[in-house]
Swiss-Prot record:
Protein's name according to its UniProt entry: Cobalamin biosynthesis protein CobD
Pfam families from the UniProt entry: CobD_Cbib
Main localization (coarse): membrane
Function: Converts cobyric acid to cobinamide by the addition of aminopropanol on the F carboxylic group.
One GO cellular component, as annotated: plasma membrane
Residue ranges of the TM segments: 59-79, 81-101, 153-173, 241-261, 292-312
Topology in the lipid bilayer: Multi-pass membrane protein
Gene name of the encoded protein: cobD
One annotated GO molecular function: ABC-type vitamin B12 transporter activity
Organism classification: Bacteria, Pseudomonadati, Pseudomonadota, Gammaproteobacteria, Pseudomonadales
Gene Ontology BP annotations: cobalamin biosynthetic process; porphyrin-containing compound biosynthetic process
């Protein structure tokens, strides 16, 4: 991995954001839909029966979706003269730091203006829960949770896998993460077919998530963040989101989690963090935490490069 190319990828994302009009992941999403229609038997059966929707079909679909593009990224990254450009563009396409701010900041602005309906509408672009009945604290909580968790998935984990394996690493991660978002549901349609996508995403996010939790702790209320991570994260249903959100909530000094409505059903989630309910300004604080953490990671990468541990 080139530390300088990693910095270049982050700069490109900060300057240009997501590609306008066309994004590689949009085309990949269409491919994933076609593969799911072809291989997911439980899509037709409408039930997670042992006789249909075998996990092996999900594994096959995952391999067909991810491995050819990962190998293509590896081959292109090895090209003389053009390989460096492929590396930087691969990271740029995988990052979502600027996009995260572009989606979260309007929520905070609407809350500041007292426009709760607009805040609910805006936060609906960030989260999958039902936002129609959220009060101001509920909107701020949903947005803050999304910033902390998506900061891990869409920013830090991409940087991690780019640091480990360059363009093929970040392509492998980003495509796997996208398939988890599309197939990783615990329902009749996807419970068997999406099992591989969900498990692979858990594996790929295991180390990055814990580095992110440590980053949040170092940049916020360290003692409280570490305590929340240790005591509260095991209660969360996701092995990777738990440490990230617990440490992030502790670092910010707010409460996250609690009751939320998903697809018409009330879910009682564990409470994370310590302190008051979040407000609109805490959305900005969460964004600042994510951005400061990215700068810290880039400084660490630059330091490793200066010591000769990473090539230029």
């Amino acid at each position: 991995m080139s530390a300088l190319l990693g910095i270049l990828g982050v700069v490109l994302d900060a300057r240009f954001g997501e590609p306008q009009g066309w994004h590689p992941l949009v085309a990949f999403g269409r491919l994933a839909d076609r593969l799911e229609r072809r291989f997911n038997r439980s899509r037709l059966a409408g039930e997670a029966d042992p006789g249909v929707g075998w996990r092996s079909h999900g594994v096959t679909a995952w391999v067909l979706a991810v491995l050819p593009l990962t190998l293509l990224a590896w081959a292109l990254a090895e090209l003389p003269y053009l390989g460096w450009l492929v590396q930087a563009l691969a990271l740029y396409a995988a990052l979502g730091l600027r996009s995260l701010g572009e989606h979260a900041e309007p929520v905070a602005l609407a809350l500041r203006a007292g426009d709760l309906d607009e805040a609910r509408r805006r936060v609906g672009y960030l989260v999958s829960r039902d936002t129609r009945e959220l009060d101001q604290a509920g909107v701020a909580r949903a947005a803050t949770e999304s910033v902390l968790e998506n900061g891990s998935d869409a920013v830090y984990a991409a940087l991690f896998w780019f640091a480990v394996a360059g363009a093929p690493g970040v392509v492998l991660y980003r495509l796997s993460n996208t398939l988890d978002a599309m197939w990783g549901y615990r329902n009749a349609r996807f419970e068997r077919f999406g099992w591989a996508a969900a498990k692979i995403d858990d594996i790929l996010n295991y180390l990055p998530a814990r580095l992110v939790a440590l980053t949040y702790a170092l940049l916020g209320d360290t003692r409280q963040a570490l305590r929340c991570w240790r005591e509260q994260a095991p209660q969360w249903d996701s092995p990777n989101a738990g440490p990230v959100m617990a440490a992030g909530a502790g670092a910010l000094g707010v409460f996250l989690g609690g009751a939320a409505i998903y697809h018409g059903e009330l879910h009682q989630r564990p409470l994370l963090g310590s302190g008051p309910q979040p407000q609109g300004r805490d959305i900005y604080r969460a964004l600042a935490l994510v951005r400061q953490g990215v700068l810290l990671w880039l400084l660490v990468l630059a330091g490793l490069w200066a010591m000769g541990w990473l090539h230029a």
